[in-house]
Swiss-Prot record:
Cofactor note text: Manganese or magnesium. Binds 1 divalent metal ion per monomer in the absence of substrate. May bind a second metal ion after substrate binding.
Catalytic activity: Endonucleolytic cleavage to 5'-phosphomonoester
Top-rank EC class of the record's enzyme: hydrolase
InterPro entries: RNase_HII (IPR022898), RNase_HII/HIII (IPR001352), RNase_HII/HIII_dom (IPR024567), RNaseH-like_sf (IPR012337), RNaseH_sf (IPR036397)
Gene3D superfamilies (alphabetical): Ribonuclease H-like superfamily/Ribonuclease H
Name of the protein in question: Ribonuclease HII
Entry's Gene Ontology BP terms: DNA replication, removal of RNA primer; mismatch repair
GO MF annotation, one: manganese ion binding
Annotated residues for binding of a divalent metal cation: D24, E25, D116
Metal-binding listed as a keyword: yes
Phylogenetic lineage: Bacteria, Pseudomonadati, Pseudomonadota, Gammaproteobacteria, Alteromonadales
GN (gene name): rnhB
Keywords in alphabetical order: Cytoplasm, Endonuclease, Hydrolase, Manganese, Metal-binding, Nuclease
Similarity comment: Belongs to the RNase HII family.
Amino acid sequence: MATFKSLTEADLLSFSTGLIAGVDEVGRGPLVGDVVTAAVILDPNKPISGLNDSKKLSEKRREALFDEICDKALCYQVGRASPAEIDELNILHATMLAMQRAVAGLNIAPELVLVDGNRSPIFVAHNGAGLTSHSIIKGDGLIASISAASIIAKVTRDREMDVLDAAYPQYGFAKHRGYPTKAHFEAIAEHGVFDQYRKSFKPVKALLGL
């Protein structure tokens, strides 16, 4: 019997009569910006070659696949949680909320939702129907729809960091993407933090004396 580690969308579709949405997140670790998630329902009649965990792909390849996913997927949706929501809920619960928003925003209700990682929130479709979901450890490298979601989320967040970099070039967001690097620590020590920072994260709390 197949296990989740070896299941593909084709395997899963043989067990169900409906469509599958893959879900993944990007941006749990950075000190600044939204945590970004994506939900993708791929079209089984329009396969996309080269899908993989977004972290294992070059930026150029991610960008190309992003465009192909947007063109060929049956539907996709980005969901997010803001720094204020992260501070209020904590990063785990904010990530679950962002995933729920992504799935609820799909204009097609999937029969099954597959989430990268070791936990899954309760999902409700745009029409209010409850959805079955499963979490799959390292699913972004195993299940095509989760790989696609990881690419959509990663490219979306990277582009947002580029916008933030243009507004605040002294922080170097285009290089470190908001993650807690030495260069980033030096930048916030010199320039302080602004409203897009996650004030509940230890390095930011320490700087603010909270």
